[in-house]
């Protein structure tokens, strides 16, 4: 499902569902995967750091996905029991770059290592995952099955390892184009 390396989400999981379902992260990663694999989803109407932590503990949530701002808010709650997230076995950060300081604060406070992948709405959204790879904190891991990824220069040629470039990808999860907007589609998609 959302992870690779044998530690996937499954029917015994309880998923924290606080992300808005109008966003691809909430719709596909949280709700869609949960429905597909049979996980229970604890739907939360509005994020509040304290009541969110209490809900995770009360309902035995095992999978939490959220943006760095959510994780930072949880790490910033004063006087919270460090074991309040002890039921969580998968902790995923997405929707924005995860600052190293936030990852470190969450690990120091709760003993949880955050996994940060890479994705975008146009790729439904997951492209890479560090789960099961041993990738260090700050790495987005490797491509998920079926996705091919290249980093290229301005001419579309592959760059050397360590050089900056633009991410190009393809796979069955990549969209066919923007609805009724051929110009926008042509600006981001190539024939190959």
Whereabouts are the PLM-identified features?
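Conserved beta-loop-beta connector loops within the AMP-binding
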Residues: 150-168, 187-188
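Acidic/polar helix N-cap motif
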Residues: 48, 153-155, 181, 185
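Conserved ANL (AMP-binding/adenylate-forming) active-site segment centered on the GW(Y/F)…HTG consensus within
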Residues: 111, 173-192
């Amino acid at each position: 499902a959302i992870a690779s390396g044998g530690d996937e989400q499954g029917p015994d999981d309880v998923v924290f569902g606080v992300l808005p379902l109008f966003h691809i992260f909430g719709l596909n990663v949280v709700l869609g995967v949960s429905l597909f694999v049979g996980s229970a989803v604890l739907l939360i109407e509005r994020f509040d750091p304290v009541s969110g932590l209490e809900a995770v503990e009360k309902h035995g949530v095992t999978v939490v996905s959220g943006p760095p701002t959510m994780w930072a808010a949880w790490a910033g709650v004063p006087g919270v029991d460090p074991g309040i997230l002890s039921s969580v076995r998968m902790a995923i950060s997405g929707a924005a770059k995860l600052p190293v300081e936030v990852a470190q604060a969450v690990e120091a406070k709760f003993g949880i290592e955050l996994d940060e992948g890479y994705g975008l709405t146009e790729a439904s959204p997951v492209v890479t995952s560090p789960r099961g790879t041993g990738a260090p904190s700050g790495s987005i891991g490797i491509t998920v099955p079926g996705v091919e990824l290249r980093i290229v220069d301005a001419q579309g040629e592959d760059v050397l390892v360590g050089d900056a470039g633009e991410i190009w990808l393809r796979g069955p999860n990549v969209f066919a184009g923007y609805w009724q907007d051929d110009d926008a589609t042509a600006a981001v998609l190539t024939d190959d």
